[in-house]
From Swiss-Prot:
Membrane topology, Extracellular segments: 56-279
All copies of domain Thyroglobulin type-1, residue ranges: 193-254
Gene expressing this chain: Cd74
Induction: Expression is induced by IFNG and LPS, through CIITA.
Annotated spans, Disordered: 1-23
GO cellular component: endoplasmic reticulum; endoplasmic reticulum membrane; external side of plasma membrane; extracellular region; extracellular space; Golgi apparatus; late endosome; lysosome
SUPFAM superfamilies per the UniProt record, alphabetical: Class II MHC-associated invariant chain ectoplasmic trimerization domain, Thyroglobulin type-1 domain
Phenotype caused by lack of the gene: Mutants for Long isoform or Short isoform exhibit similar functional capabilities.
Organism field: Mus musculus (Mouse)
InterPro entries in UniProt: CD74_antigen, MHC-II_Gamma/Thyroglobulin, MHC_II-assoc_invar/CLIP_MHC-bd, MHC_II-assoc_invar_chain, MHC_II-assoc_invariant_trimer, MHCII_invariant_trimer_sf, Thyroglobulin_1, Thyroglobulin_1_sf
GO MF entries: amyloid-beta binding; CD4 receptor binding; cytokine receptor activity; macrophage migration inhibitory factor binding; MHC class II protein binding; MHC class II protein binding, via antigen binding groove; nitric-oxide synthase binding; protein folding chaperone
Record's subunit section: Nonamer composed of three alpha/beta/gamma heterotrimers. Interacts with CD44; this complex is essential for the MIF-induced signaling cascade that results in B cell survival.
Covalent S-S links between cysteines: 196-215, 226-233, 235-254
Domain of life: Eukaryota
Record protein name field: H-2 class II histocompatibility antigen gamma chain
Length: 279
């Protein structure tokens, strides 16, 4: 009986003894899972932090790149020659032409000379050519030999040779026109009236309500024209065309030089039209 009890008690104690070694194994697995989870969380947090800092640094690098490009463009703009005005500046100044000139502005200062440049076809061509290459068309105000010498000094060798060849051809052409026959005396041609003189000749000296232009001693239009009946005065081009935005009852001064950045180009067209012709 004692032996059976010992066997039964031993048999009942064996499962309990067999279960005890499994508890440390479960604890070690739980700790391993916890450690792996914490490590993964730390790695993800590190990756997120790194991405955030890289995003901030990328924004700063973009700003530095834009600033560097702006500085380079500004440096190039400062190195460009300032003889020719950019077309963009002329277009930005164009809206000033659309604003009517008030009487206060007319009385504050004299109107600058917009009659220095005509509005004929040759004036348009000259203005456009000087804009594209102002150094190729110098100011020639001396005598004919002085102007030729100045041209030779200002032009390069190739262009001067071309110009010299053209002068030779022109000289031969002029020499070939000379005739050995005696020239018959020709009658003096009748005096041709200028446009201003012809217009004045059709209007009596005293004619109320009619506009009678004023001419100088050479028959050209005076820069300042006035209508006595209305009291308005305005500036005109050499061909008598009215300069835009100069008609008022204020004081005028049409003899001062015109600044190219002022109201108009001096050619009877707006700066916007000149920009369109250039493009």
């Amino acid at each position: 009986m004692d032996d059976q009890r010992d066997l039964i008690s031993n048999h009942e104690q064996l499962p309990i003894l067999g279960n005890r070694p499994r508890e440390p194994e479960r604890c070690s697995r739980g700790a391993l899972y916890t450690g792996v989870s914490v490590l993964v969380a730390l790695l993800l947090a590190g990756q997120a932090t790194t991405a955030y800092f890289l995003y901030q640094q990328q924004g700063r690098l973009d700003k530095l790149t834009i600033t560097s490009q702006n500085l380079q463009l500004e440096s190039l703009r400062m190195k460009l020659p300032k003889s020719a005005k950019p077309v963009s500046q002329m277009r930005m100044a164009t809206p000033l032409l659309m604003r009517p000139m008030s009487m206060d502005n007319m009385l504050l200062g004299p109107v600058k000379n917009v009659t220095k440049y005509g509005n004929m076809t040759q004036d348009h061509v000259m203005h456009l050519l000087t804009r594209s290459g102002p150094l190729e068309y110098p100011q020639l105000k001396g005598t004919f030999p002085e102007n030729l010498k100045h041209l030779k000094n200002s032009m390069d060798g190739v262009n001067w040779k071309i110009f010299e060849s053209w002068m030779k051809q022109w000289l031969l052409f002029e020499m070939s026109k000379n005739s050995l026959e005696e020239k018959k005396p020709t009658e003096a041609p009748p005096k041709v009236l200028t446009k201003c003189q012809e217009e004045v000749s059709h209007i009596p000296a005293v004619y109320p309500g009619a506009f009678r232009p004023k001419c100088d001693e050479n028959g050209n239009y005076l820069p300042l024209q006035c209508h006595g009946s209305t009291g308005y005065c305005w500036c005109v081009f050499p061909n008598g065309t009215e300069v835009p935005h100069t008609k008022s009852r204020g004081r005028h001064n049409c003899s001062e030089p015109l600044d190219m950045e002022d109201l108009s180009s001096g050619l009877g067209v707006t700066r916007q039209e000149l920009g369109q012709v250039t493009l």
